[in-house]
Every structure is written in structure tokens, then in C-alpha cells.
């Protein structure tokens, strides 16, 4: 299974119209494959939308996208609002739940870490051992690594009912000594991070994941 994460930077004050057009066009596009999630940024880089699509593999992605374009079902007419577009193919870790329609948020914290080249196996070993303890405090939405697009990236997404709940949950996990993951505490080789960023996302009205 793969997830395509498409991130678009859009012009200021265009979000409502962009989401409206995506939502309307998706009604025709969905017969080819279901949208996994559609978010916009609330905190972090502003004027940004992210849509996530789940596919069996790259071949299925190519086939579905070609059929949708040929049918005129996709993409939506939003070109006048788009400043920048990027697409990344993500592979889920073993600890990552399959994303399905439902309510987990409405606040989603997306944290993107860039690790040193070659350190993915070390990072994965630490996180797959550490996350089960973290899950005692709140659920995980996704844990992915990049296969195509920006390389050496690790993305983890955490849903919360409120921003206060986010802060309280992180404080409790930290106080319990289980978060953030520590390679030394787990007796595993240390991986190196070269960059970190986070953003708070909220779902559009038509997003299957709320």
C-alpha cells in the first residue's frame, strides 16, 4: 500500500473557493478511487492544502489517475489559485494504521522529520519499539517514510480533539518518560535528524477523515 500526499500552496483568501471546487469535482472523481483525507493548514505554513490518496501500488495510481483525467473528472479547475504543487509517495511503517473514513480529529498535527541519508532503518527500529507506549496516551493517525518526492523524510500524524488536549497529552507522555523516542533508553542505535517541522491541519467538510 502507498499513500500519495499532494501539497498545494494557494493564494491568500482563496481557501474557501478552492475547497468548494475540490469538493464538487470529487463527486465525479470518487468513482475511480476514494479520497483518504483532505486538510488545510491552521497553524504553520498558511494557505496550504493537503490531499491524501491511497493506492495499492504505483501502477494502480497511474491507471486511476489516467482514467479520471480522460473522463474529465479530474483535476478541479483551481489553477488560478495555485502557487506551488508537490507530490510525495509515502510508505507506511508497520505501526501505522490504515487510514479509513471516520472521526479522529478535528485537529491533526503533522510532523515531518528529515533524517540523515541511510538512517531510515535505525529510525524505524526506534519508532516501532517506542510508539506502543505512546499509544497509551493518544492514537496515531499515520507513520510514513518517503519513497518518491522529498527523500529521507519521516512523517507522523497525530489527531486530537482540541489543541489543549494535544498539549496535555504530550506533557503526560513526556512526564512518563516514553516520549519523545529515545534510542539510548531502548538500547538501539541512534539515528540522526537534520530538520524538523510541524503543522496543525484541519479537515475540509468533504474529507472522509474528520
Predicted regions and their residues:
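N-terminal beta-strand motif that seeds the catalytic metal site of vicinal oxygen chelate
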Residues: 4-7, 107-115
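Hydrophobic pocket/interface hotspot
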Residues: 6, 18, 51, 61, ...
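Short amphipathic alpha-helical segments
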Residues: 14-35, 67-74, 117-142, 165, ...
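Glycine-rich beta-strand-turn "strand-cap" elements at beta-sheet edges
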Residues: 34-50, 54, 72-107, 129, ...
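Short hydrophobic interaction/assembly module
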Residues: 56-66, 77
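Helix N-cap motif at beta-to-alpha junctions
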Residues: 12, 54-60, 116, 159-165
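The feature marks the first
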Residues: 1-58, 138-139
Amino acid at each position: 500500500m502507498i499513500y500519495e500526499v499532494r501539497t498545494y500552496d494557494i493564494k491568500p483568501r482563496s481557501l474557501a473557493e478552492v475547497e468548494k471546487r475540490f469538493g464538487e469535482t470529487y463527486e465525479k472523481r470518487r468513482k475511480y478511487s476514494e479520497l483518504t483525507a483532505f486538510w488545510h493548514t491552521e497553524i504553520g505554513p498558511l494557505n496550504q492544502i493537503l490531499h491524501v490518496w491511497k493506492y495499492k501500488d504505483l501502477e494502480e495510481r497511474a491507471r486511476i489517475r489516467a482514467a479520471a483525467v480522460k473522463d474529465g473528472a479530474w483535476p478541479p479547475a483551481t489553477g488560478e489559485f495555485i502557487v506551488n504543487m508537490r507530490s510525495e509517495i509515502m510508505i507506511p511503517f508497520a505501526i501505522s494504521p490504515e487510514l479509513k473514513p471516520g472521526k479522529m480529529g478535528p485537529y491533526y498535527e503533522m510532523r515531518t522529520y528529515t533524517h540523515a541519508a541511510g538512517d531510515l532503518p535505525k529510525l524505524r527500529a526506534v519508532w516501532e519499539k517506542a510508539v506502543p507506549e505512546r499509544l497509551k496516551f493518544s492514537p496515531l493517525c499515520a507513520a510514513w517514510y518517503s519513497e518518491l518526492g522529498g527523500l529521507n523524510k519521516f512523517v507522523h500524524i497525530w489527531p486530537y480533539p482540541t489543541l489543549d488536549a494535544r498539549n496535555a497529552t504530550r506533557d503526560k507522555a513526556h512526564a512518563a518518560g516514553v516520549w519523545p523516542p529515545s534510542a539510548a533508553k531502548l538500547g538501539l542505535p541512534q539515528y540522526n535528524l537534520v530538520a524538523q517541522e510541524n503543522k496543525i491541519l484541519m479537515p475540509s467538510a468533504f474529507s472522509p477523515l474528520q
